């Protein structure tokens, strides 16, 4: 039939590397067979820039939105398509910054795969960014529960990392959690004061802080141990342990040094989630803000520009809608 002919044509044009024709053929195909999940998945892939070996071109706002629309079709027709779930989650969070939509997206995935840990990891990562720590704790408990399917090393590491992130962040904010939608929140004054200070990168921090300390420990242990035959391997081991310990301890220090930047990151997340603004103009014109925006995906930068243009304020009473709580 025409459907299978079109699908063959689409496959051939994709093999030739002709993404536009592939997209055109698949669009024609889904207008004839709206339930063709493979064709929708191909549309979702073709709407995005071609995967590159070197520097990857990132999708624009329009490309991202079109791809997400197609992916919503895919997961509706073929909920077992893991790749579609993962891609949709990445686009919603990293390229659109739509945290509420992403929470719902992963909640739907949980409906189809209740024993899978990935959706929980993703939901926890979103809730941490938005500052909802109590909800994180419940999900983490669920994530490590015996009902969940067994996971491989990579996922086990991600689970450990995400729960560490939660405990670090909630410790840092134990005095008060920053809610950017409250214009009178005391953290805004601190961001205003530090708005010329860009965040310190981990690499620079390790070089300025950890390296000199390690050098000091190394020299000191050489003096104490002397230069017998086994001195060098011993000093090396002391150094290694010292560097690892200092790096771990100093990451908390780095986090508190960069707290104003983490706060402003959250304010940007609030803006992209609500489509409304909460960042004062004096801060939006600052070196801190532009250094954070440089690290964002192009689609997010486009969205923020549109949100700033429409200039609607986030209501002070706004609260993140969390699907898990409305079950």
Tell where the protein language model's regions lie, with residue ranges.
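Transmembrane alpha-helical hairpins and terminal membrane-anchor modules
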Residues: 196-270
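Structural signature of tandem alpha-helical TPR/SEL1-like repeats
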Residues: 16-24, 51-70, 96-105, 132-138
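Canonical positions in the second alpha-helix
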Residues: 28-29, 73-74, 108-109, 142-143
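Short coil turns that delineate tetratricopeptide repeat
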Residues: 34, 79, 113-114, 148-150
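Alpha-helical segment of the N-proximal tetratricopeptide repeat
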Residues: 1-35, 42, 48-59
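TPR/TPR-like (Sel1-like) alpha-helical repeat modules
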Residues: 62-68, 109-112, 125-151, 164, ...
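TPR alpha-solenoid repeat register
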Residues: 39, 84, 119, 152-155
């Amino acid at each position: 039939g025409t459907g299978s002919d079109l699908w063959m044509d689409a496959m051939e044009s994709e093999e030739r590397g002709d993404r536009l024709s592939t997209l055109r053929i698949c669009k024609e195909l889904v207008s004839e067979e709206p339930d063709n999940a493979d064709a929708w998945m191909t549309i979702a892939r073709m709407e995005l820039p071609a995967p590159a070996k070197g520097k990857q071109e990132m999708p624009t706002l329009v490309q991202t939105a079109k791809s997400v629309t197609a992916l919503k079709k895919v997961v509706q027709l073929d909920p077992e398509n893991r790749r579609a779930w993962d891609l949709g989650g990445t686009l919603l969070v990293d390229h659109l910054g739509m945290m509420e939509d992403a929470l719902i997206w992963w909640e739907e995935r949980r409906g189809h795969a209740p024993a899978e840990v990935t959706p929980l990891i993703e939901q926890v990562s979103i809730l941490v960014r938005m500052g909802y720590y109590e909800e994180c704790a419940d999900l983490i408990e669920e994530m490590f529960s015996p009902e969940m399917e067994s996971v491989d090393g990579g996922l086990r590491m991600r689970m450990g990392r995400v729960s560490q992130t939660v405990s670090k962040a909630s410790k840092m904010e134990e005095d008060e959690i920053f809610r950017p939608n409250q214009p009178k929140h005391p953290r805004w004054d601190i961001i205003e004061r530090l708005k010329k200070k860009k965040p310190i990168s981990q690499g620079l921090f390790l070089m300025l802080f950890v390296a000199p300390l390690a050098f000091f420990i190394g020299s000191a242990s050489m003096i104490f141990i002397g230069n017998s035959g086994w001195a060098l391997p011993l000093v090396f081991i002391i150094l290694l342990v010292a560097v690892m310990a200092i790096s771990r301890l100093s990451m908390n220090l780095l986090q508190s040094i960069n707290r104003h930047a983490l706060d402003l990151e959250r304010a940007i997340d609030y803006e992209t989630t609500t489509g409304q603004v909460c960042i004062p103009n004096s801060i939006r014109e600052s070196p801190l803000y532009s250094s954070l925006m440089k690290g964002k995906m192009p689609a997010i930068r486009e969205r923020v520009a549109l949100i700033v243009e429409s200039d609607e304020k986030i209501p002070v009473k706004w609260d993140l809608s969390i699907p898990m709580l409305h079950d």
